[in-house]
Amino acid sequence: MSETVVVRVKPGSRKGPLVETADDGTLTIYVQERAVDGKANAAVTKLLAAHLGVPPSRVELASGATARLKRFRIS
């Protein structure tokens, strides 16, 4: 069974790496990596996996590869 997590990404942030949870359950993830060549997506995947306590191999980007609002599938 898989779960979907909605994430708002803030790439190139001086605040990161950091995960914040909004009242509606949406996660905001701040990463220092810029959104170039998938570096920010890779950093978000690793940080989200650590936040959820699962291996990074179980976290898959479902949609939003080039958007700031992303959906990740956790298997």
UniProtKB/Swiss-Prot annotation:
<comment type="similarity">
    <text>Belongs to the UPF0235 family.</text>
</comment>
<dbReference type="Pfam" id="PF02594">
    <property type="entry name" value="DUF167"/>
</dbReference>
<dbReference type="InterPro" id="IPR003746">
    <property type="entry name" value="DUF167"/>
</dbReference>
<protein>
    <recommendedName>
        <fullName>UPF0235 protein MSMEG_3845</fullName>
    </recommendedName>
</protein>
<dbReference type="InterPro" id="IPR036591">
    <property type="entry name" value="YggU-like_sf"/>
</dbReference>
